[in-house]
Amino acid sequence: MILGIGTDLANIERIEGTLERFGDRFRNRVFTDREQARAERMPEPAAVYAKRWAAKEACSKALGTGLRMGIAWKDMSVRNLRTGQPVMEVTGWARERLDQMTPDGYGAVIHVTLTDDHPWAQAMVVIEALTPEEAELRPDLGPAARRTMS
């Protein structure tokens, strides 16, 4: 069952300007150390940051709150599997909100997709609730260790 859907579009040039203007103050407020390390080793860091910005916005919308009600930027984090597939991880109040919206007996899976085509970066997040039996039938979710199951 679908619990939430969120999407966001970010302007890479706007994120680049914010990075130039505020530097580490902006990076450290919005992005985890892991997200910063990935962005800084890429040829176009601003595009990587913009995709992660959009993913956090999309995730907050899928959680049904937007960036309010106590959800902090760093409560949502994007990492990549070895295959390059992005994975959304939630902690803090974002995790609490996810647990609140997940029905008893179900686990939540957060699906995220990212893309960019200069000057735009886009993210879409779908939060799905699965029973343990349904999760076992879904090899596309990968190993249980990478799932955001409640």
Curated annotation (Swiss-Prot):
GO cellular component terms listed in the entry, alphabetical order: cytoplasm
UniProt-listed Pfam families: ACPS
Catalytically driven reaction(s): apo-[ACP] + CoA = holo-[ACP] + adenosine 3',5'-bisphosphate + H(+)
Classification via HAMAP family: AcpS
SUPFAM superfamilies associated with the record: 4'-phosphopantetheinyl transferase
Record: residues binding Mg(2+): D8, E57
Keyword field contains Transferase: yes
NCBIfam families, per the entry: acpS, pantethn_trn
A GO term for molecular function: magnesium ion binding
Subcellular location: Cytoplasm
Protein name per its UniProtKB record: Holo-[acyl-carrier-protein] synthase
Family: Belongs to the P-Pant transferase superfamily. AcpS family.
CC cofactor: Mg(2+)
Keyword Magnesium: yes
Function recorded in the entry: Transfers the 4'-phosphopantetheine moiety from coenzyme A to a Ser of acyl-carrier-protein.
Gene Ontology biological process terms in this record: fatty acid biosynthetic process
Taxon lineage: Bacteria, Pseudomonadati, Pseudomonadota, Alphaproteobacteria, Rhodobacterales
Keywords associated with the record: Cytoplasm, Fatty acid biosynthesis, Fatty acid metabolism, Lipid biosynthesis, Lipid metabolism, Magnesium, Metal-binding, Transferase
Domain of life of the native organism: Bacteria
EC number: 2.7.8.7
Source organism of the structure: Jannaschia sp. (strain CCS1)
